[in-house]
């Protein structure tokens, strides 16, 4: 088999993987509540033993009950942060065994609300004391793609979007709302380092690499809209600097070693990166990505776009 043929086959396998398993972010089933506290706090099996005076800060994690969001909450708590999660689900999905622990006090403050509604975010920040926001809201297949029901099988959170779940509303609008509120909050409180961490995608940088625009040109329209939404948020965050410190992570495929169903896609991404396809970055474990994001929040010198080399440096590979 020639090198060209091998690369073509890997590229084809990668494109299939991209279409079906690109990412595992969360957007939970809808609720009519603007922003409320669920009846219980859910256990994430991590305890924050630091006092408020020792804490590196207090953060709001948007989409904190999803695949990546839960990992960020756990890691942030372990690093000493005070953590509030906002999602439409309110509480993360729990097994029957885990549900028996709900009466125990845990340190992550889970709130139920819709980040498409600005009031949901501003109400939480108005409580004061926040030093950063992490945006982990997203979805692979939106309602306009005609494939939204497949999210139950390819989404890390197994969420099914509602009729109003489009890339523009879920990715762009929720992030724009949060960025605008964060900017106002930082100015009002005279904060010199309010961090905003956004989960973008490696493919958002395709225009800057060889072959990127060519590959993007053959993607279905719904995947192009996915990338348009990511890029619009990146631009919005950059425009908000230096009032807020922009942290933009661009992971490739996000996976977890305890989910073997993702290994087909992971192998395709690793193979494409190994043979030198410039438009394919290495996959990253959800644990490594979460650690990267939390370390970036703590380190005031970290800002801008973080691709795989930076993710590997900050968060490792495990």
Spell out what each predicted region is:
Residues 1-38:
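N-terminal chloroplast transit peptides
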Residues 57-81:
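N-terminal Rossmann NAD(P)H-binding glycine-rich loop of SDR-like oxidoreductase domains
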Residues 60-62, 89, 146-228, 239, ...:
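Conserved Rossmann-fold NAD(P)-dependent oxidoreductase catalytic core, especially the SDR/UDP-sugar
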Residues 81-88:
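Conserved glycine-rich Rossmann-like NAD(P)H-binding loop of the short-chain dehydrogenase/reductase
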Residues 92-188:
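NAD(P)H-binding glycine-rich loop region in Rossmannoid oxidoreductase-like domains
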Residues 174-177, 229, 280-296:
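Substrate-positioning beta->alpha
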Residues 206, 244-272:
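Flexible, glycine-rich beta-alpha linker
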Residues 268-284:
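A conserved pocket-lining segment of Rossmann-fold NAD(P)-dependent short-chain dehydrogenase/reductase
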């Amino acid at each position: 088999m020639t090198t060209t043929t091998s690369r073509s086959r890997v590229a084809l396998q990668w494109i299939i993987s991209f279409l079906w398993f690109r990412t595992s972010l969360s957007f939970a089933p809808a609720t009519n509540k603007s922003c409320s506290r669920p009846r219980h706090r859910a256990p994430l099996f991590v305890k924050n033993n630091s006092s408020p005076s020792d804490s590196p800060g207090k953060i709001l994690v948007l989409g904190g009950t999803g695949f990546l969001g839960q990992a960020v909450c756990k890691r942030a708590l372990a690093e000493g942060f005070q953590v509030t999660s906002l999602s439409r689900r309110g509480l993360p999905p729990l097994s029957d065994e885990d549900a028996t622990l709900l009466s125990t006090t845990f340190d992550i403050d889970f709130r139920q609300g819709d980040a498409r509604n600005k009031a949901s975010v501003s109400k939480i920040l108005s409580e004061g004391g926040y030093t950063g926001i992490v945006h982990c809201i997203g979805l692979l297949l939106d309602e306009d793609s005609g494939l939204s029901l497949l999210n139950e099988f390819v989404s890390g959170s197994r969420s099914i979007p509602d009729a109003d779940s489009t890339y523009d509303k879920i990715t762009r609008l929720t992030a724009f709302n949060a960025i605008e509120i964060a900017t106002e909050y930082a100015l009002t409180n005279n904060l010199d380092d309010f961090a905003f961490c956004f989960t973008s995608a490696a493919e958002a940088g395709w225009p800057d690499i060889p072959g990127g625009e060519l590959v993007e040109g053959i993607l279905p329209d719904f995947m192009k809209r996915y990338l348009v939404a990511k890029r619009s948020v990146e631009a919005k965050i950059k425009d908000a600097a230096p009032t807020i410190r922009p942290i933009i992570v661009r992971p490739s495929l996000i996976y977890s070693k305890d989910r073997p169903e993702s290994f087909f896609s992971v192998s395709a991404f690793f193979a494409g990166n190994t043979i030198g396809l410039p438009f394919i970055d290495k996959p990253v474990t959800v644990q490594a990505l979460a650690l990267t994001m939390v370390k970036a929040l703590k380190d005031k010198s970290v800002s801008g776009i973080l691709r795989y080399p930076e993710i590997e440096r900050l968060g490792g590979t495990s």
